[in-house]
């Protein structure tokens, strides 16, 4: 199996990629819709800075998705959240679906 099957990506989120900071606050790129499987389960995850933070949702996307940490994401119910971090999950040729795990605040 190469990639997570498209029929599993039942939800759509809108991602505004984080581009950096300015004197007026964070800068985001243009919004784009991303097909994902959304799991709204609260758990503790580690941020890129090493802090333990609470993630309220995890989205699973196709492995080629580009979602930088600190990007803004709008979930199907309208909740706007921030990407804590992402993790590429590659089975290395095993019969597991490769995907991108997106941990959301």
Label the predicted regions.
Residues 6, 19-105:
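Short, conserved turn/kink motifs that form compact alpha/beta structural patches or helix kinks used as
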Residues 8-17:
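A short, Trp-centered hydrophobic/proline-enriched beta-strand micro-motif
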């Amino acid at each position: 199996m190469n990639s997570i099957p498209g029929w599993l990506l039942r939800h759509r989120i809108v991602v505004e990629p984080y581009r950096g900071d300015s004197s007026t606050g964070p800068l985001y790129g243009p919004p784009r819709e991303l097909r994902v499987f959304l799991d709204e389960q609260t758990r503790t995850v580690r941020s890129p800075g090493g802090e333990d933070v609470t993630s309220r949702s995890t989205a699973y996307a196709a492995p080629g998705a580009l979602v930088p940490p600190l990007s803004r994401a709008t979930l199907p119910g309208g909740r706007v959240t921030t990407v804590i971090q992402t993790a590429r999950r590659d089975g290395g040729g095993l019969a597991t679906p490769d995907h991108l795990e997106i941990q959301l605040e």
